[in-house]
From Swiss-Prot:
Protein's job: Glucosyltransferase involved in the biosynthesis of the non-bilayer-prone membrane lipid alpha-monoglucosyldiacylglycerol. This is a major component for maintaining a certain anionic lipid surface charge density, for balancing the bilayer to non-bilayer phase equilibria and for keeping a constant lipid bilayer spontaneous curvature (curvature packing stress). Catalyzes the transfer of a glucosyl residue from UDP-Glc to diacylglycerol (DAG) acceptor to form the corresponding alpha-glucosyl-DAG (1,2-diacyl-3-O-(alpha-D-glucopyranosyl)-sn-glycerol).
Note: PG could also protect the enzyme from proteolytic digestion of the proteinase K, possibly by orienting a lysine-rich face toward the membrane.
Membrane topology, as annotated: Peripheral membrane protein
Family classification: Belongs to the glycosyltransferase group 1 family. Glycosyltransferase 4 subfamily.
Keyword terms: Carbohydrate metabolism, Cell membrane, Glycerol metabolism, Glycosyltransferase, Lipid biosynthesis, Lipid metabolism, Magnesium, Membrane, Transferase
Name listed for the protein in its UniProt record: Alpha-monoglucosyldiacylglycerol synthase
GO biological process: glycerol metabolic process; membrane lipid biosynthetic process
Names of required cofactors: Mg(2+)
Entry coiled-coil feature ranges: none
GO function terms (MF aspect): 1,2-diacylglycerol 3-glucosyltransferase activity; hexosyltransferase activity; magnesium ion binding
Activity regulation comment: Activated by the negatively charged lipids phosphatidylglycerol (PG), cardiolipin (CL), dodecylphosphate-rac-glycerol (PDG), 1,2-dioleoyl-phosphatidylglycerol (DOPG) and phosphatidylserine (PS).
Length: 398
């Protein structure tokens, strides 16, 4: 098959969507398919030329939260260029410029279109309109819902990563058909076996982490909806009982200055370290310096970094959300909490009982096998073939 993946974000940008697209592309290519990524040009000098990545010029978006992204205007003028690819199926991973182009290509070529819902915008109305979110939240949610619905309605199939999102789409009465396919991950870079003890020690030395320190880690976009402040508050309390501890926060985002200010106000910068952006190829090594993974977000559609942490044999201690029921077994490979004081108690408990930490760690890596990128690609391949077959039969009847 010749597959066109339309995405607003791609390498060198780093995000959950980019990770999903990269893994899908590599997985499908391993199955023998020809895969093209159609995406805006991120900048003039920060990407490698790849004939399978079609880059389209766009305008800088003057919003701090969308740094690195580009707005492509009048996308339909690029439809003719896409026709030269002779695509069999279109797979859309965005709701904006490239999504509109993907819909136009599928319609013009009369081929199936698939939409993966990465973000339910009704949980992120502050990105749609801060004014409406503040003064008319119901109107903001209604407007946000239309962003997703234009794709669920017009694509042949919408992929959602979890049953939670599937149920939500049905409950909110979004148009279209839905199927559940968890996004896949290239698990190998996160396995402990991928690194030598010398590599891990070198990173610890670089960060000033002693071997006897207990280390918690978070890898996330630094944004309001991630509730990272709750983790900071809890870790400060935990540190009072176990001062031989460290919390490493990896990631960047619009709320990083706010987070740094909070840490400074708690006089915690000595043991809570925000490292900012880390290259994607190096993230797997950073997981190896930690003992546990923490997260307090309840707005995840699938939680790819959670699976990465589990693949690195890290128990995850996370605020409960039913999206995590798919891969977290409370007390087996992770621990759920709801309130900050519960998180503090859990941290103290596993610090006092290292055998519990060992059991959780042992079970963590095993639980990630269903999320391998090979499984993800095979599931998408099966879906594409089914949609192509149905579409061909429909066209032959006309």
């Amino acid at each position: 098959m010749r597959i066109g993946i339309f995405s607003e974000a791609y390498l060198p940008l780093i995000s959950g969507v980019v990770t999903s697209v990269v893994n899908l592309k590599e997985g499908l290519e391993a199955l023998g398919h020809e895969v093209y990524v159609i995406t805006p040009i991120p900048s003039k000098d920060k990407f490698e030329n790849d004939p399978s990545v079609i880059r389209i010029p766009g305008w800088v978006i003057p919003r701090k939260s969308l740094k690195g992204f580009r707005l492509v205007l009048f996308v339909k003028r690029y439809v003719r260029k896409m026709r030269k690819l002779k695509l069999d199926v279109v797979h859309i991973h965005t709701e904006f410029s490239m999504g509109k182009l993907g819909l136009a290509v599928a319609k013009k070529e009369r081929i199936p279109s698939v939409y993966t819902l990465h973000t339910s915008y009704q949980d992120y109305t502050h990105y749609v309109s801060k004014l409406l979110t503040r003064f008319a939240p119901n109107a903001a949610k209604k407007l946000a819902g239309k962003i997703n619905n234009q794709y669920t309605k017009n694509c042949h199939m919408t992929i959602v990563p979890t049953k939670k999102i599937y149920d939500k789409m049905i409950r909110l009465k979004h148009d279209g058909e839905f199927t559940i396919i968890p996004s896949g991950i290239n698990l190998k870079p996160f396995y402990k076996s991928s690194y030598t003890s010398e590599q891990v020690q070198a990173l610890k030395d670089k960060l000033g982490i002693r071997n006897d320190e207990f280390v918690a880690i978070l890898v996330a976009r630094i944004a309001k909806e991630k509730s990272i402040g709750d983790l900071v508050e809890a870790f400060v309390e935990f540190y009072k009982s176990y001062p031989n501890s460290r919390f490493i926060i990896i990631g960047d985002g619009p709320d990083k200055p706010v987070l740094d200010k909070l840490i400074d106000s708690k006089k915690a910068s000595k043991y809570i370290n925000t490292l900012g952006f880390v290259k994607n190829a190096e993230v797997g090594l950073y997981y190896q310096i930690a003992d546990v993974f923490l997260n307090a977000s309840t707005t995840e559609t699938q939680g790819l970094t959670y699976v990465e942490a589990l693949a690195a044999s890290l128990p995850i201690i996370v605020r409960y959300d039913d999206v995590f029921d798919a891969f977290v077994e409370d007390g087996k490979n992770g621990i759920f909490f709801n309130k900050n004081e519960e998180l503090v108690k859990h941290l103290i408990h596993i610090r006092q009982n290292p055998e519990i930490l060992g059991t959780l760690s042992k079970n963590a890596e095993i639980s990630t096998k269903p999320y391998a990128k090979e499984v993800y690609a095979k599931s998408c391949e099966t879906l594409y073939l089914d949609l192509i077959d149905k579409n061909n039969k429909k066209l032959n009847k006309k």
